[in-house]
């Protein structure tokens, strides 16, 4: 069946485009007083089966042609959109391809202009160290080992490994002609912006073989002088720096935890710090026939390497958390308190665990319901 066009037929098809109702109506147009339904049935009975089938097929053909034209318009619309997208991608691809081609041609021209120089450069031994220019090191690098450039390595240490440590060289002097230099370097530990501390070293350094010969302490902040006394007595420079950095980290977390507890409890209790901010005291007054005071003390102690009670082989600071509880001046059993403290911190972590400890000790009515 051809749905494309009817213009090629030699015979007259004007009647074939009439609908079924139009064809029936032409036989009895003048009989207006006859019932319509009965008239249609009578007229259909006058048509043979072939004529009825032809009329139905013509109606289906017209509907299909209309649907076909609609689909062709949609196809044309999508083709136009696709052509626009392809044109834009082609332009971008041409630009990228041209850049790659131009770079390749430049490399060919450089290598072909003086091939002997490239071979001689490979044969010549290049000495690369931390003071070598970064671009020169990259040109001569054929392995996957870390870069030696001192500035690049220091930037990674500063930005990623020790982001809260500021290092500044105060002075640099050469001693005689043996390659030894005296550096005065200041280290500032500033994780806790409200209470930072500094330590200044005098170092005798031999750059030729990258050796730290000896070092001295010129100045140290008073807020860590007593705490770091045993650590600095070890005379291990790397151990001292790493331990002080970890001490600053733990101290900053302790300050944040105590401040969070104070903000949560200050409306219903009285909170204050003691023992150089190593202990938080929380007091609540309740009425049980008479006024009774519940006092909770949270101790957050940081022990440095070399202090008493610290494992011998441990070179990093450690923290120990304990609590003490009084009610009406009478102290509770410490063994039971230690078990409660250990269990809640193990279950919830330090921050949430201490919050639950405060609720259990200061607001027991919350758990009695």
UniProtKB/Swiss-Prot annotation:
Q: Mainly resides where?
A: nucleus
Name the keywords, alphabetized. Cell cycle, Cell division, Centromere, Chromosome, Coiled coil, Kinetochore, Meiosis, Mitosis, Nucleus
Q: Which residues form a coiled coil?
A: 51-87
Q: Which domain of life is it from?
A: Eukaryota
User: Is Coiled coil tagged as a keyword?
Assistant: yes
GO biological process assignments: attachment of spindle microtubules to kinetochore; cell division; chromosome segregation; establishment of mitotic sister chromatid cohesion; meiotic cell cycle; mitotic spindle assembly checkpoint signaling; protein localization to chromosome, centromeric region
Location(s) in or outside the cell: Nucleus; Chromosome, Centromere, Kinetochore
Give the GO cellular component terms, alphabetically: COMA complex; kinetochore; nucleus
The UniProt entry's sequence similarity note says: Belongs to the CENP-P/CTF19 family.
Quaternary structure and partners: Component of the heterotetrameric kinetochore subcomplex COMA, which consists of AME1, CTF19, MCM21 and OKP1. The COMA subcomplex is part of a larger constitutive centromere-associated network (CCAN) (also known as central kinetochore CTF19 complex in yeast), which is composed of at least AME1, CHL4, CNN1, CTF3, CTF19, IML3, MCM16, MCM21, MCM22, MHF1, MHF2, MIF2, NKP1, NKP2, OKP1 and WIP1. COMA binds the centromeric nucleosome-binding protein MIF2, and to the outer kinetochore MIND subcomplex. CTF19 interacts with the CTF3 complex subunits CTF3, MCM16 and MCM22 as well as CHL4 and IML3.
Functional summary from the UniProt entry: Component of the kinetochore, a multiprotein complex that assembles on centromeric DNA and attaches chromosomes to spindle microtubules, mediating chromosome segregation and sister chromatid segregation during meiosis and mitosis. Component of the inner kinetochore COMA complex, which connects centromere-associated proteins and the outer kinetochore. COMA interacts with other inner kinetochore proteins to form the inner kinetochore constitutive centromere-associated network (CCAN), which serves as a structural platform for outer kinetochore assembly.
State any further remark.
Present with 1254 molecules/cell in log phase SD medium.
The protein depicted here goes by the name Inner kinetochore subunit CTF19
Q: Which organism is it from?
A: Saccharomyces cerevisiae (strain ATCC 204508 / S288c) (Baker's yeast)
Taxonomic lineage is: Eukaryota, Fungi, Dikarya, Ascomycota, Saccharomycotina
């Amino acid at each position: 069946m051809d749905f494309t066009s009817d213009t090629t037929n030699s015979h007259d098809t004007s009647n074939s485009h009439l609908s079924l109702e139009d064809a029936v109506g032409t036989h009895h147009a003048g009989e207006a007083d006859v019932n319509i339904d009965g008239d249609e049935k009578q007229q259909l009975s006058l048509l043979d089966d072939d004529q009825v089938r032809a009329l139905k097929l013509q109606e289906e053909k017209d509907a299909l042609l209309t649907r076909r034209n609609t689909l062709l318009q949609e196809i044309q619309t999508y083709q136009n959109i696709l052509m626009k997208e392809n044109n834009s991608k082609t332009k971008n691809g041409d630009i990228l391809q041209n850049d790659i081609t131009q770079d390749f041609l430049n490399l060919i021209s450089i290598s072909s202009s003086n091939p002997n120089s490239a071979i001689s450069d490979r044969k010549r031994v290049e000495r690369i160290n931390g003071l070598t220019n970064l671009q020169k090191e990259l040109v001569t690098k054929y392995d996957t080992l870390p870069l030696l450039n001192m500035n690049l390595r220091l930037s990674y240490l500063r930005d990623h490994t020790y982001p809260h440590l500021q290092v500044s060289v105060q002075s640099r002097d050469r001693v005689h002609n043996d390659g030894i230099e005296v550096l005065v370097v200041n280290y500032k530990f500033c994780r806790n912006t409200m209470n930072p501390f500094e330590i200044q070293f005098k170092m005798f350094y031999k750059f030729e073989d990258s050796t730290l010969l000896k070092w001295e302490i010129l100045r140290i902040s008073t807020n860590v002088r007593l705490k770091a006394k045993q650590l600095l007595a070890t005379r291990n420079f790397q151990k001292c720096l790493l331990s002080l950095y970890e001490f600053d980290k733990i101290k900053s977390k302790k300050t944040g935890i105590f401040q969070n507890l104070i903000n949560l409890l200050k409306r219903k209790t009285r909170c204050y710090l003691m023992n150089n901010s190593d202990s938080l005291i929380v007091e609540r007054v309740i009425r049980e026939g008479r006024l009774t005071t519940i006092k909770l003390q949270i101790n957050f102690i940081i022990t440095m390497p070399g202090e008493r009670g610290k494992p011998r082989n441990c070179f990093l600071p450690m923290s120990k958390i304990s609590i003490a509880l009084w009610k009406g001046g009478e102290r509770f059993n410490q063994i039971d308190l230690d078990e409660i403290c250990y269990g809640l911190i193990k279950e919830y972590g330090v921050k949430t665990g201490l919050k639950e400890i405060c609720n259990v000790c200061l607001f027991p009515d919350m758990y009695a319901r």
